[in-house]
Amino acid sequence: MPFFVVKRDLPGVTPEILQSAAVRAKSCCAEMTGEGQPVRWVRSFYLPETAQTHCYFEAASKSAVEEANQRANIPFTQIVEVMEMTPEMV
């Protein structure tokens, strides 16, 4: 399945808000997967200097990732398909 990055601008976000969003994202992905539309939240990185997060998902489509984030009520500015590269792959 393809990978996607979800970019977010979250000025004023707190660790508690991030934790709550993570719980909702995990729950909504599990819910959608149970409904036959697999979405997997892989990981997120918070960039404190810019108050942004980059959240990585694996799903069949961009629209599935968008739906998971909407269900979780987590705002986003952009969703982009990405290509995974790791040191082990080269």
Spell out what each predicted region is.
Residues 1-33, 47, 62, 84-90:
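Short S/T/G/P-rich N-terminal loop/turn motif that feeds into the first structured element of a domain
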Residues 29, 52, 77-79, 88-89:
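Short amphipathic alpha-helical patches
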Residues 58-85:
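An amphipathic, aromatic/His-enriched active-site/gating alpha helix that lines ligand/cofactor pockets
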Residues 38-44, 78:
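A short linear hydrophobic-aromatic micro-motif
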Residues 2, 37, 75:
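Residue-level signal for beta-strand positions within conserved beta-sheet cores that form or flank
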Residues 42, 46-54:
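Amphipathic, hydrophobic secondary-structure cores in small proteins
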Residues 5, 54-56:
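Conserved hydrophobic/aromatic beta-strand scaffold that supports enzyme active sites
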